Amino acid sequence: MIIIAYLLGSIQTGLWIGKYFYQVNLRQHGSGNTGTTNTFRILGVKAGIVTLTIDILKGTLATLIPIILGITTISPFFIGFFAIIGHTFPIFAQFKGGKAVATSAGVLLGFAPSFFLYLLVIFLLTLYLFSMISLSSITVAVVGILSVLIFPLVGFILTDYDWIFTTVVILMALTIIIRHQDNIKRIRKRQENLVPFGLNLSKQKNK
């Protein structure tokens, strides 16, 4: 199951769509990343939506497979984490993958939909306020860590501690933050790419 999840995650949707349908190598354009945001920016809305959908479904499917097969000896959420590893370090693309946001969302959607929806609201609110995908992703990662530690104490969304769930959420979030180090530097310099949505409270001018 772990190998299947990893191979699912290794599917590089944006990279392959760019190569086979647009004759564009995403690694040579924009941020050079093969994930959803750069796909939207370089290849357009249609390619971006397809990439986002498939990257989410990779995580969801990897999480649901053990549930569908009735495997109870290992946590489906733990299995799903290997789809995130595959997305980030894909065997099909020289181990150079995306930033783990969409696939992490898919894993949460498959295992903890209420927690996923809560974080989605945080993501969309941050995006509306600041018009930055990267800042929204980083914010959700930080909020995710805090929430998985605090919510079980008060019984909000997460009713009790599950050490596997807590550990995997923290690992997912740290992966996202680490993969966004270049974005963090650009945000600090007020040079980060913006999306045409929201209030842009930082009043940064798009490049």
Swiss-Prot record:
The keyword Lipid biosynthesis applies. The keyword Transport does not apply. It comes from the Bacteria. The chain crosses the membrane at residues 1-21, 42-62, 65-85, 105-125, 138-158, 159-179. It is found in: Cell membrane. It catalyses: an acyl phosphate + sn-glycerol 3-phosphate = a 1-acyl-sn-glycero-3-phosphate + phosphate. Catalyzes the transfer of an acyl group from acyl-phosphate (acyl-PO(4)) to glycerol-3-phosphate (G3P) to form lysophosphatidic acid (LPA). This enzyme utilizes acyl-phosphate as fatty acyl donor, but not acyl-CoA or acyl-ACP. Belongs to the PlsY family. HAMAP family: PlsY. This is Glycerol-3-phosphate acyltransferase. It comes from Streptococcus agalactiae serotype Ia (strain ATCC 27591 / A909 / CDC SS700). The lineage of its organism: Bacteria, Bacillati, Bacillota, Bacilli, Lactobacillales. The gene is plsY.
